[in-house]
Structures are given as C-alpha cells and as structure tokens.
Amino acid sequence: MFPIFDPIAFGLYLLGYIVMIIVAVVIAPKVASSISGRFTLYGAMALTAVLIVLTTAFVIYLIAIVAAPALAEYGWGFILGMIFFVVLMNLITYIASPFLINVTYGARPDPRLQEIVDAVASRLGAPFRIKAVVVDGPPNAFAYGNFLTGRYVAVTSSMLALTDKRELEAVIGHEIGHHLHRDNALMLLFGVLPSILYYLGVSSVRIALSSSNNRNNNTMLLAAVGILAVVVSFLVQLLVLAFSRLREYYADTAGAKAAGKEAMQFALAKIHKFYFSNPEAHEIISGDKFRALFIYALVNAVANPFITVTRSEIEEIKRSSYSVIQEIFSTHPPIPKRLRFLDQLQI
C-alpha cells in the first residue's frame, strides 16, 4: 500500500520549487533583459530547444555514467521503468485529450466556420484537412488533435460573436499555424523531459537512501545527482515555458499571413480588452486544464459582440505594463509584447 505522504518526494519537490522561484524572480528577468533583441524568433527557438535537450541529456548522463556502479547494484530496471511510465502516461494523455476536449467543451461541427477554416488553410498552404468545431465558453480558440482523431481548430461561439471576418481569419490562421508547426507533438516531446528528470531524480535519491550501505561513495553520489536532477527539472520547466511562448509568436506569424498584421492585432486587442473589463471571470480560464492550448491563456471574459477596439487603444495596450514574473510562468506571452512583435514582423 502506498503511503499518503512521501517525505522524500515532498522535500525534493519543495527544494526544486524554491530554486525555481528564486531563478524566476532574481535571475530570469535579468537574463531576458540582457538578451532581448539579440536573436531572431527562429534563433531564439533553436537556442531554447538546444538548451532544453542538452541540459536534460547532461543530467541523464550524470546519472547513467557517473553513478553507474550504484545504479547497477540498486535499480537500473526500476529507474528505466520509471522513465517508460512517464513517457507512456504522456502518450496516453496525448491520444485521449482530443476525445476529452470534444466531450468537455461540447464540440460540434459548423458549416460556416468550416468554410472559413478551409479558406484560411488553403491560403497558408496546409497540406492536410482541418476540422472546424464550435465549442462553448468565453471567447477563445485553440488547435488540438493527433494521428488518430485528425486535426481540429475549435472556436468558441463567443469568439465568433466578438470578431469580424478578417479578425476571425487571423485567429484561425494562428491556430492552423500550430498545426503547420506541429506544436502539439513538439510540446508533448519537450514537456515530458522535466517530468523524466524529476522522477528520475526522486527515484535515484530513494534508491540511495534505502540502500543497506547508504554511506558508501556510490550511493552518496547517486543521492547527490538525484537531488541535482530534481532541481534541474524545475529549471528545464522554465525553459519549456519559454519555448512555448516563442511558439505562440511563431503561430502569430501564421495569423498575420492569413489575414494581415492589423487583423491579428485587433483580434488580440479585443481579447485583451475583455480581460480587463471582466476580471470576475478570471477563474474560468485560469483554472482550465486545457488553457495551454488557447490563443490567450489568461482571457477571462464573457463575450460582448458590441465591444470594439480602436487603433489608439491598440497603441495604448502596446505601452501597457505587465508582470515579468507572471510571463515567466506562462505558456503565452503578454498581449502587449505580441502586439509589438507583430509591428516588427515582415510578411
């Protein structure tokens, strides 16, 4: 029978979380400020991806090679089984999530929306068919699907009421961009790496501490590397979030190509305006388990088709402040930065 409270796992999680908070509050903003504007979008994505992969590979190398004697004696099979379990659970989630989304959000086909999605997909050169569905909820849109279910673009009925045709095409273009860029599969791949490091680290520490001779060099080294793996797993998670934000910029380029930069900006600005005019609805989206898929993960408004946005309001939003700390822990960049990015975009 498994214990309700695991002090080893809790202590390691707390340590990793504290280190992550310190890095996010003290170090990450300074690093972001120092490298801002030094890389193109493609360069930033490539650099972040390389950092994620190399950091993960290095820590696994430490456990596999540096602590090999201890692992050979105390549990190679268990640790490899743990990695397999983490990967398997993520694959099951990836396969099941489209079915869950269809049920959870009441996804239903819409012929008019399908025509728009088909037109935008053709404009962007999509080589595959994308199913269009309308779902319930606050104004939002998201892309999902896999090799079993096919590809979907979901738009809430309130988003249809909020946007005009060009703005809707920009939003749909953003979501089709996620499909073209294979972001669902890519984020699944990168998202599993912190989990592998975390469970690998916890398992290593547990094996070291449960050894009958846990004071020898091998087991002490295994425990030290295990603690390092847990801490690094939280830092890699910050890199994965940064990579996700970069992919959102990348999807915005598809939205701009589909309907123009101005339409993309007006659509984002309308969502932003809803956010500030309806703070009471924040919990609806911020607590949603699928919020990472949304075009705007923090949108929290109920649709009002009579809300409009002017160019002067967009310029004001571009200059508005935002929490750097909140951005670091978010899957999506803040709207002011996305609007400024679109200004600089050459299409």
From Swiss-Prot:
Q: Is Transferase a UniProt keyword of this protein?
A: no
Which E.C. number(s) belong to this protein?
Answer: 3.4.24.-
Reported cofactor(s) = Zn(2+)
**Catalytic residue list:** E175
Q: Known InterPro entries for this protein?
A: HtpX_protease (IPR050083), Pept_M48_protease_HtpX (IPR022919), Peptidase_M48 (IPR001915)
Q: Got any disulfides in this one, which pairs?
A: none
Where does this protein reside within or beyond the cell?
Answer: Cell membrane
Name used for this protein in its record: Protease HtpX homolog
What are the transmembrane regions?
8-28, 46-66, 76-96, 185-205, 221-241
Q: Name one GO cellular component term.
A: plasma membrane
Q: Which GO terms describe its molecular function?
A: metalloendopeptidase activity; zinc ion binding
The protein's predominant localisation is membrane
